[in-house]
Amino acid sequence: VLDYKIITSMDMLEPYRSTWSGILEQEKNNNPFIEYEWVTTWWATLGIHDNVEIFIVEHQGTAVAFFPLVHTVGFGKIHYFGFLGQGYATYMEVIAEKQWMERAIHYILKVFTQKYKRYLLVFQGLIESKDTSQQLEKYAIEYQMPYSIFRTVTSFIDFQSMTVDDFLKKHRKTFKSIKRYEKKLKLFGHLDFQDVGVNHFHKMFTLFTRRWRKKLDKSRFTEAQTRLFYERLADVSNEAFRVEVDSLQFEGHWISFTIDLCCRDRNFCQAMGHEPDFNRFGPGSLIEKENMLKAHDSGFRYYDFGSGYEPYKFQWYTDIDFTRKFIMSTKGTTERFIRSWMVLRDRVKGKLTNNHQLVKLKRDRLGELLYFLKHARTREWLRLMKGVLQRIVAIHRIDIYIAEQKYDQGYMPFEELHMKDIMTLNERPAYIAHFYKGNRFFGDGDQIVYRRHDHIAYEEVSGYTYELSANMSFIREYDTQLLKEIVVEVQREGRSVCTIAPWYEGRRRRKLKQAGFHKVSQITLVRLFKWRKEFHAKQ
């Protein structure tokens, strides 16, 4: 004979800790979201205001199943039941031994019918291949209950499905591309992949905030209670369950991170983030590659990307499963109507969220627009209007100046600055972009004096570009007060010096002539929508 209890506080649940964990250990559970530590930590932080009710099914006084639910009463006095952790738990299921799963589910649903008469079940995160999902559907069919199911794909790597060599071979093009990013970044400084203790979690949240500051983020990952949740979760780790945070650091500065929930043979990737200033170097791909190989070396069988249709989740996968949203109601008119409305809403939502281009438009472009409207100053508005106008019609006239080679040794030496030297500067995003394009920076102390490129001359406003001769350097963003010293500094290497000045900057052109430059060419660029024409006039 089966019986049940309703647990409404953590104190009431504590005596069942060993039974709960024992069932999961016996069933070799690898779903981190139903581990006792995850559930109780969520309840104590994020779910403190929810009406949590954990239904325990007992057989002869021994707990054989746990249903971790949130119970509310809504319109028409209909009772709503859903799994706890909604919005934070990707997967959820009933905690029960396989032999008791069917009986426990059938029993508790009959209890709902007798006790509440009219109810609506909304169970999210059901793993399609697991027993909970199958038994719920079986019950609905057997008792002819109105129900609907929505599926979302879940991609993962099964390291036992192929050898590491075969995996590397299958993705050799992707690995080759990542290696190029890694090699290029290492040219600028030291790169380090390392695990992180809870005392450094604040850096993870700071980086995530920077990553999403211009996007629409609904994850609530950086909210105060969510931070507290993950910090507490990291402190309750055990042999079966633990939180791992890894960072990719460039010269001691975080440029990407991963936070994983590890449960027995499964490594679930909870969240990733990277420094937007380093987008050109692919920091997200770099740390994902390192994290996957680490998971394999640590003995995990599964590397789980979670549910969703984001393209990056299908870059590496070997297998897929599905997570279900299961909606079932009793047969009354009101609850059937509400269920039908929920089904319609979820179908529309599914069509929209499965369209990745539409998701990007809303998340990225709309996010950038809202960020701009909130933070833009007069200068940014003027720059925007100028940019819009120049996309339609624009005329640019620029003058090219050259200072010929000299071997004068009376120069003022400037120190070459490396990427690590500019990591704390406000202009870091622009400087990193210039480093990536092959520019070099020179300065006096911590003050940047000029930027130099030895292969290409580039004018940012007009987009004009041309290749330099073998013994010529292009300088830009120079300190006009030190222009003579800059020229001598470059010329001492036996190189000519090239720069560009727009026609309306008379003072700069005079400074260039005083420093030994002479104008060699005038370029006029005309743009009308996508049509573009260059006119060259030799001097």
Where are these regions (language model features)?
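Active-site/acyl-donor-binding loops of N-acyltransferases
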Residues: L2, D131-D165, S298-F372, A376-L417, ...
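Residues at or immediately flanking beta-strands
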Residues: L120-V122, D192, Y302
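Acyl-group handling in specialized metabolite and lipid biosynthesis
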Residues: V94-K98, F193-Q194
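Hydrophobic beta-strand segments of well-ordered beta-sheets in folded domains
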Residues: M92, K117-G125, T465, A470-I475, ...
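C-terminal non-catalytic accessory extensions
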Residues: D408-H434
